[in-house]
Amino acid sequence: MRICLVLEGSYPYVHGGVSTWMHAYIQAMPQQEFSLWVIGAKAQDRGKFVYELPPNVKEVEEVFLDDALRLHGERQPVLFTADERTALRELVRLGSPDWDVLYRLFQEKGVHPLSFLQSRDFMELFKDICLQEYPYVAYADAFHTMRSMLLPVLYLLTGRVPKADVYHAISTGYGGLLACMGGSLNHAPVLLTEHGIYTREREEEIIRAEWVVPSFKSRWIRFFYMLSEEIYRRAFRVSSLFYNARRTQIEMGCNAEKCIVIPNGVQYERFCNIPLKQEDGWVDIGAVVRLAPIKDVKTMIYAFFEIGRAHV
């Protein structure tokens, strides 16, 4: 069996929790073949792996989002069908597009991303959105925001699709979308394992981001929610690490019957002989954390302080 792992910004380029897990996951099933379909931010990272890939990794398909910025070519007129036009309209409006129609449009029909983004259909949709949602925002800001939002997605939809018997996405977002496209085109099952809730992480980043025009922050957030809806709908199984994450997935629209929790385990033998603290009347609370903005360690420290002050 060939398993295609779809990853974004992690294995095999960087060390970390997801990467460590992925490496162990592949090594634990030497009888299975794996393809890696990996999304990176910059093409300059091509081939710069920090892991020695196990021998059962048979293929690595690398895709880099900044390559979308280098797309060029003259606009080729395209005559869209009614279904294609409806799906594209829903995509631009960040609604509920028929992704199967879009997969076929950009894969089988071979439509170039710029052929749509420079088409009359797109400009009419864009004009309507500006009039309805952003009447007081500069036209240039609106245009470049919309283009930068859609171009990477359309670029990903035109890329090569590795063949596999099952597609396993390790996040929603761009990676989840590629897994769904692979499953759709090759009639293969799709499953999702979320190490963290990708959409919520992007939402927090967007809220804090200075590069996002304030008027468009809600639109960027809607964009990532739209992507997550596709894999929550298509995946036959959705797993997370803890029950609050499962609850969040369900709140975001995933069918509860699909959602399971597989907690991280520990090797009990490594920790069972740690001596207990000598009794001194205090309750000591420790934390093993990674220093990263998404972990919000600062709030944890404040919480420890407030708890300690309340009980002095």
What is the predicted function of each stretch?
Residues G95, V101, T158-G176, L185-L191, ...:
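Short N-terminal targeting/anchoring amphipathic segment
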